[in-house]
Amino acid sequence: LKYELGIINEMGFDTYFLIVWDLCRYAREKGIWYNARGSAAGSIVAYTLDITLVDPIEHGLIFERFLNPGRVSMPDIDLDFRDDLRSHMLEYTARKYGDDKVAQIITFGTMGARAAVRDVGRVMDIPLSEVDRAAKLIPNIPGKPMSIPEALEQVADFKQLYNSTSYFKELIDTATKMEGVTRNAGTHAAGVIITDKPTIEYIPLHRPTGSAAAEDNPIKTVTQFEMSNVDALGLLKVDFLGLSTLTIMARACDLIHERQGERYHLGNIPTDDPATYELLGRGETAGVFQVEGSGMRRYLMQMKPKTLDNVIAMVALFRPGPMEFIPSYIKRMHGDEEITYRHEMLEPVLKETYGITVYQEQIMYTAMNLAGYSASDADYLRKGVAKKKADVLLEHRQKFITGAKENNIPEDIANQIFDDWEAFARYGFPKGHAADYGVLAVQTAYLKAHFPVEYMTALLSVYQDDTDKVALYVADCRRMGIDVKPPNINASGWDFTIEDGPERAAAIRFGLGAVKNVGHGPVDAILTARADGPFSDIDDFAHRADLRQVGKRALECLIRVGALDNFGSRPALLQALDQLTSISASHFRALEIGQMSLFGKQSGVIEKITLPEISAEVGRREQLNWERELIGLYVSDHPLTPVLDLLNQTVT
């Protein structure tokens, strides 16, 4: 700790740590869940200040991976906050340090190959269909953009089009010159700079555009310099990220406290619970942070993790590149494959990962233990390996071999170890980052294993706008034996809620906010009217809820998903929709113009709603399709119910 404090002071970063500590302190005081991730997890100072939540000594993390006294660059701590309260943190930062001393960071969008063709074609007044034909011939591969010159070399049809007419040749030649040119300005999703004097004294500023220009954004300025230039100037930068997982966990823990009386937070959710690892080993990971994908689920079922270290390793390995080592890791873990080391001195470093190099920190420890590197030099080595700089690699190869020889390690073995590192460069992953995310993965699994109703309710509420995820998580609820009830005008809130049965067989009730085309305004109007008690019938609903505020479209969608089934059949309610909205509007207009009696009651006769005589069974399949369309799944029934007995006899 004394060593770290000395380095931080020598490098002039005391203020940086205190500002980040202040942000975390405020978040704790206001109940805003946060998590600091990345290489900062290697700092004991950050851990003791409650900036990071992972013990660096327990997990073998290295301070110099985060802050190297020989590499003068600004520290970088990424702060994840629950995404629904991230704006509160930005507001506090602007208020505490001054509106004129904080700014977000600009980004520049450049013109891609297709966009260049389309923009140039528009200026040249070439027919849109022709321009579109040219643009679509350039392959659009996510993560592997192809430039116009590459397309001319590799795509025969594009080359043929280029040679076909003079105007296509001019279009493509001009677009080639425009490709890569800055097209628009945006705002970095997370980066915020904080200065001691007005920001304008350090860096030119810009008015934000897009979502960053919204009135509710507490930070009103953006730098004119992008991230790399901000770093080069040495300005203090903090990344404010929003993480929905923290929102889910916080909401679930609030429900647990409300229903069970237990108070959980990130500091006391266990990571050593056997039932949690059993859940992970069964692959029941829908809604569990970082591990819910089908590939990850398959490997977890093979692994049967027993400890947090197992999960941390899987988080690091489950990426393109290292994924090829997962089968070997699992076999070694279960004793089905021999654990081997290039040299016996590697065992203390690689034992936790069964002889396989998984983390960047393992390269650093190996260089320190086998070749006498200092932690700072080991960090330079790690960086050189990661960036594949030939001159740096050659220099370090010679240095490593020389140091290894002094420890009686043969040159050929030292060369083999270094060769392994060069291959490792394809997938090296910082253990600090994997540990942060591994802890959250295990903690979310714990909440799901022990408090499934509360956890799934929070999960569904956060993802209620994503019908695909809602369908997935509702199916998982049903697998766990948790009943998910349809939206109901008298029982649902905006979010999903928990309903306890007579014997505490808790169920989850769909939130009205999960219904498509039903926004906050309509739901607020309904909930405000319902504050005096449930609606007794359709007349009571129309005369207590101002359906002008609800809106005809939202009301129609609520009827279609069955939220008003207590008041009549869906077809009948839909036919009476105009009558329903008209009577409600007349009633509330009368209230507004003061047609009230002396004692505050409406004068005259309350107009009754007459529902048409229609069988409730009419259009059953169509009603289920409405549910599928508006909330993403069948909730009141299933189209296969009539043939379920037959299916049970014939399908296994």
Pin down the residues of each PLM region.
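Noncatalytic, beta-rich nucleic-acid-contacting surfaces in large DNA/RNA-processing enzymes
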Residues: L1-T652
